[in-house]
A protein has these predicted regions:
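N-terminal intrinsically disordered/low-complexity leader segments
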Residues: 1-7
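Helix-turn-helix
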Residues: 11, 19-61
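Hydrophobic/aromatic residues within well-ordered alpha-helical segments
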Residues: 51, 58, 62-66, 77, ...
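Hydrophobic alpha-helical connector segments
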Residues: 72-106, 158-165
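Amphipathic alpha-helical packing segments from all-alpha helical-bundle domains
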Residues: 83-87, 105-106, 120-148, 160
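Amphipathic C-terminal alpha-helical segment
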Residues: 95, 99, 115, 120, ...
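Hydrophobic alpha-helical segments that form the core
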Residues: 106-114, 138, 156-175, 187-195
Length: 197
């Protein structure tokens, strides 16, 4: 009979997620993970198989939570479409402000992973592409609604505008990670909103 796990797997995933988010995949060693999780190597391997599988689970957890939060904002039918997108940018800006350390943001685990791994890891690239498509589909529906209702003036294709908004959000994350101050990233968001109007 297998021994029951003596740790909280959800808490371990959250801790691993924050560690990968702060350090990146390559810069996080199995030893680092054992240390922050308070587990020995065999416990980590028994629970998660290896560092890569732990990373994939942590990334999935991050994407599920982040995308669900963004889609919840976009699904607020109490607000006009343009205000839902403004609320989404406000959430992104607030998250960047909350996750600053030493003048630099942590960015976004999804964006960080795209830059670090997507070009050389097809499985991770597919995970990231599916997540981006979920967010783009939600944005596209809101933009289409806003165009129909007249509160989004741009006549460009909603799918193109959704990809644009996603790219701006990624750019905000990278700028914050590079040390851009609040005024700079707020201006980026405001410029994107102007492009939609």
């Amino acid at each position: 009979m297998a021994r029951p796990r003596s740790f909280d797997e959800d808490r371990a995933l959250d801790t691993a997620m924050r560690t990968f988010w702060a350090n990146g995949y390559e810069s996080t060693s199995t030893r680092d993970l054992c240390e922050v999780l308070g587990l020995d190597r065999s416990s980590v391997y028994n629970a998660f198989t290896n560092k890569r599988e732990l990373f994939k689970r942590a990334l999935t957890r991050y994407m599920d939570a982040t995308t669900a939060d963004q889609l919840r904002i976009l699904d607020d039918h109490e607000l006009p479409a343009i205000e839902r997108i403004r609320a989404l940018f406000a959430r992104i800006l607030r998250t960047e402000a909350e996750n600053r350390r030493d003048g630099h943001g942590l960015g976004c685990l999804t964006v960080n992973t795209t830059m670090e791994l997507a070009g050389r890891d097809p499985e991770i690239a597919l995970m990231l592409a599916r997540d981006a498509e979920r967010r783009a589909a939600g944005l596209s529906a809101v933009i289409r609604s806003g165009q129909r209702d007249g509160d989004i003036g741009s006549t460009r294709d909603p799918a193109e505008l959704a990809r644009f908004v996603n790219a701006v959000i990624a750019g905000i994350r990278v700028a914050a990670q590079g040390g851009a101050d609040d005024a700079t990233i707020e201006a980026i968001a405001a410029t994107a909103m102007d492009a939609l109007a």
